[in-house]
Amino acid sequence: MLNRIVAFIFLIILSPIFLIVALFIFIEDGFPVFFKQKRVGINYTFFQIYKFRSMKKNTPNVATHLLTNPKQYLLKIGGIIRKLSLDELPNLINIISGEMVFVGPRPALYNQDDLMALRVLAGVDRLKPGITGWAQINGRDEISIEEKVKYEKEYLQKKSFLFDIQIIIGTFTSVLMSKGVKH
């Protein structure tokens, strides 16, 4: 419940940033400014994640690292949106609806069977997905799925309010330094 209340407060406080990002996306590539995608939630349930669109409308609906030339699909504003993780701000809607939390494993794409199989083996599938997580601040896009699951399992074992605060602080540091951002 605390996650939902805090997300609602952040949604109100950050609404000017929402409007500015939406306006830039609209000016460059029109509507829709949001991107929704099928993701895997707690206990292997599916939900629609909301993000700001950083890619052009005609981009194939696959993980960015699977695209032959991801930069050709990136909006001009898209690089900045991703570098500052502004594309994740609409995840607040997912937190308010109860599908996500602030700290947990990043939600896998519906077709990332290899990642989900490892998460099930590690018991990490029992966690609600988060906007940020232990794996996010320990490598993000630069680590293998095995390493991600190792960090997620470690998070499961150490999960606490103070550990979540440590991860949130680490997230701000990572975002400011653009640590772990590939695309």
Question: Residue ranges of each PLM-predicted region?
Answer:
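Hydrophobic structural segments characteristic of membrane proteins
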Residues: 32, 93-183
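Short, cationic motifs built from Arg/Lys/His that form the positively charged side of catalytic pockets
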Residues: 39, 51-55, 73, 81-82, ...
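Short, glycine-rich, amphipathic interfacial segments at transmembrane boundaries or analogous
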Residues: 35-73, 131-151
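Alpha-helical membrane-protein architecture signal
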Residues: 2, 49, 70-77, 89, ...
